Amino acid sequence: MPEFDPQNRSPHLLIVSHDVVDKMMAGPGMRYLEMARVLKDEIDVTLAVPAQTSLDITGLNIVVYQEAQPGTLQVLVENSDIVLVSGYMVEKFPFLETTSTRLVVDLYAPFILENLHYYLDEPMNYQQAVNSQAVAITNCLLKIGDFFMCGNSRQRDLWLGALTANGRVNPLTFADDSRLQKLIDVVGIGFPARQPRHEQAMMRDAHPLVPGDARIVLWGGGIWNWLDPLTLVQAWPQVVARHPEARLVFLGTRHPNPDVPYHEMVDKTIALAEQIGEKDKTIIFIEWLAYMERESLLLEADVGVMLHPIHIETRYSARTRVLDYLWARLPVLITEGDVTSEWVARYGLGRVVPEGNSDSVAAALNEILDQPKAAFAQAFEPLMQRFSWPVVVQPLLRYCREGEYAPDRLNRRSPDVTTSISSPLIRSWLARSVYIMRTEGMQALLQRAWRYFQWRVARL
């Protein structure tokens, strides 16, 4: 196993992003880019990305790995002291199960819960197959990690239960730290330790439907199936009746990562906007903006909106776009039920509304728009330091500097995932095969099977 001597050199951390990191990117890409940007000033960091990027950041080494060639990532992993991984990567790159490099597992996005809503319209046997796959992959991650990160304190309780079920809460980890923060800690979403910059006009006097005196209500991210943009559109006629200068802007109808499936909620939202007669009038749909351009749009907006149904995914979610709103001191309209809604209520950052109630949404929006945006500015001050990336990333930095394996890693048996068809991960691969064949075709399934075969042969 690679040994780290803190007296001789800085530990080398490899951050592996499973999502696009470029001028246009979604929450995961932003998360890993900002982590790497902050940590590069403290330790040796490489950011590995799945596609070519045009970004060039001074002092940050960015490399490209290819899913079709697992060796491109494996050589990076085996030559690092610590690697940060997440999600389905352990399935795509099985060598992660046996690497001696220390593993940090990012549990920020609980995809088991996301899938429950995402596949809701599929046949039940298909939903169960997808769920079994997600559970098996999650359990594998929980067994092999040395340190785990999650998005908030609610998530930490959820994941502590899962870690307990996987044998990771044990006398060894308890003796190491009775609070188990050396095993799992909160590394949520932050914002840069600087003020956002308005470098170009994005909507006011720059878009033909947005006059200079417009009050902009911003849906600042993807229109995902598990969110609730429809209630916002239903409420909109009551808003423009009182504030005819208001414009509702939806950002990001299509994910910047082409591998992410299209969400039906986009079509439903556009159709409802047409139905009420406001599409391309006071309701505007724009494409995903470049990462730096979003700052200008955030500063032009008057309200940031995040509406969702209340369900299990909501309770444990951590929405990137809400942190963007907070960074720009943008008053927030949000549905109750998640952690960020508690912040909005506690600090007076906007208004919290019940789920699915268009009258409440309209009343809250009108109340916010009745006041100048500056009326809310001071309420954001207590959060500026707390949620800056240099503060948020501290638990990960502490782990990297300590350079330790989990105390139970060397004393537990490596997970046996190859000897029996009854293995949970084997069963998940069977479910995954069905899923790939249905969504990507037989050729894609055969290509993935061939890559896995090559990896197994290389280990003989």
Segments and roles (model prediction):
Residues 252-254, 261-295:
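Nucleotide-activated donor-binding/catalytic signature segment of Leloir-type glycosyltransferases, i.e.
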Residues 18, 22, 105-136, 157-159, ...:
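Acceptor-binding helix/loop patch of EC 2.4 sugar-transfer enzymes
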Residues 140-204, 212:
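Donor nucleotide-sugar binding/catalytic pocket of nucleotide-sugar-dependent glycosyltransferases
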Residues 179-180, 384-460:
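C-terminal amphipathic helix plus adjacent low-complexity
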Residues 14-17, 191-195, 202, 206-227, ...:
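Conserved donor-binding/catalytic core segment of Leloir-type glycosyltransferases
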Residues 1-54, 238-241, 436-460:
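N-terminal subdomain of nucleotide-sugar transferases
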Residues 227, 290-296, 304-326, 334-342:
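Nucleotide-sugar-dependent
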